[in-house]
Amino acid sequence: MSTLFASVEQAPRDPILGLNEQFNADTRTGKVNLGVGVYYDDQGRIPLLAAVRKAEVARIEAAAARGYLPIEGIPGYNKGAQTLLLGADSPLIAAGRVLTAQALGGTGALKIGADFLKQILPDSKVLISDPSWENHRALFERAGFPVETYAYYDAATRGLNFAGMLAALQAAPAKTIVVLHACCHNPTGVDLDSAQWRQVAEVVKARDLVPFLDIAYQGFGAGLHEDAEAVRIFAAQDVTMLISSSFSKSFSLYGERVGALTLVAGSKDEAGRVLSQLKRVIRTNYSNPPTHGGTLVSSVLNTPELFALWEKELADMRDRIRLMRRQLADKVKAAGAAQDFGFIVKQRGMFSYTGLTSAQVDTLREQHGIYAVSSGRICVAALNSGNIDTVAKAIAAVAR
C-alpha cells in the first residue's frame, strides 16, 4: 500500500543555500564560504550594527506589546523605505501616489509583487537579466509567469552588453514585466550608469513595459542616495513601477526578514485601490509581518542620531568591500594567474563575477576548500585579512 507522499520526488538543492549545507558538512579546516550573500567583518563575523543595538535596547526598555501589525506593516517602516528610495522631497510621495507594504525580506517583496501582478496581468511574461539572481526565475515561474531573459553581461569585456539589453527591451511586447537590478547587480556586480538608466526608462515608458526594480543592496555601491538613482530616474519620468527592497544586508538583520514592496501608482486614488488588493495578497500568504526586525529598522530610519550612525556603519562596510576587491585583484595577479582580474575592482556591491567556469569552481571546492556558486559568483563581502591570501592563491591556481 503506497502512502500519500510516496510519489513525491526529491527536490534539487537550492544552488546557493544548498552550497551552504555542503560547506557546513565539510570538516576541513581553513575552508572558506564565498557562496551565500552575507556581509562579514574582518574577523569573519556577521556584525551587529551599533545603530541596531541601540534601537534594540530602546525596544526592550520600552517593554512594548507584541500585538498583530497591520497587514501592510509598520507605518514608520514603510514611510522610511519610501524615503530611502525616492527621497524626502519626492513629489510622488507628497501626492500620495506611493504605497509600501512591509515584506518578509526582499524575496517576500518579490513574491507578493509577483502574485499581485499575476492577478492584473495574467497573460504577461517576465524578463530577467542574463544572468540574474538564481531565485528570480523560480519565483516568477512559481507565480505562474513564463520567464525569459534579456542580454546583460558581456563575458568578453567583463562588462555590460547594453546594446543587447536595449534591443531586448525594445522588442518586448507591451505589459512585459521587466525585472531590473537597481544597483549592485547580483551576480555580476556590473551596473548601468546614469545615462544608460535614462535610456532604459525611456524605452520602458515608450514600450509600455512594467518595470519591477529589485534593490537588495542599497548603500553597498556608492551610497544610499547614489544607489537609488535608477529608482529616481524612473520616478522623474513618471513611470508606474514596482520596487522590492531589502534591509537584510544593510542592517545586518538577515534572520529578521526585513523587506518592503513599494509601488508608484498613477494617482492617490489608484494607490489606495492597489494597496487594498495588495493587502489581500498578503493576507492569504502570511497575514501580516513580524514586529521585531521592522521595529528596529523603523526606529533607525526615523531617529536622526541612529540614522547618521547607521549611514556611517554602512559606509564602513562598503569601504571594506572595496578594499577586499582591490586586494583580491592584486593578490591573484601576484600569485601568477594567467588572466588579469582587475575587472573585479570595477564591479560594485557584495558580489563579483569571476569568470571561473563550473569545473574551475568545482576544483576550488574539492581541492582548496573554497566554496563559490557554480556560475563563478563569489561574495567579496566574505573575504577578510585572514582568508584572502588563501582565496587568491586558489583562484590563481585554477585559473592558470
What are these regions (language model features)?
Residues 57-205, 219-220, 229-231, 356-357, ...:
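Conserved core of the PLP fold type I
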Residues 95-97, 344-349, 373-378:
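Short Gly/Ser/Thr- and Asp/Glu-enriched loop/turn motifs at secondary-structure junctions
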Residues 34, 147, 211, 241, ...:
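Hydrophobic beta-strand scaffold residues
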Residues 311-367:
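Conserved PLP-binding catalytic core of the aspartate aminotransferase-like
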Residues 275-294, 300-329:
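Structural signature of PLP-dependent enzymes
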Residues 230-273, 277:
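Active-site PLP attachment segment
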Residues 2-73, 80-83, 87, 284, ...:
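N-terminal "arm"/small-domain region of PLP-dependent enzymes with the aminotransferase-like
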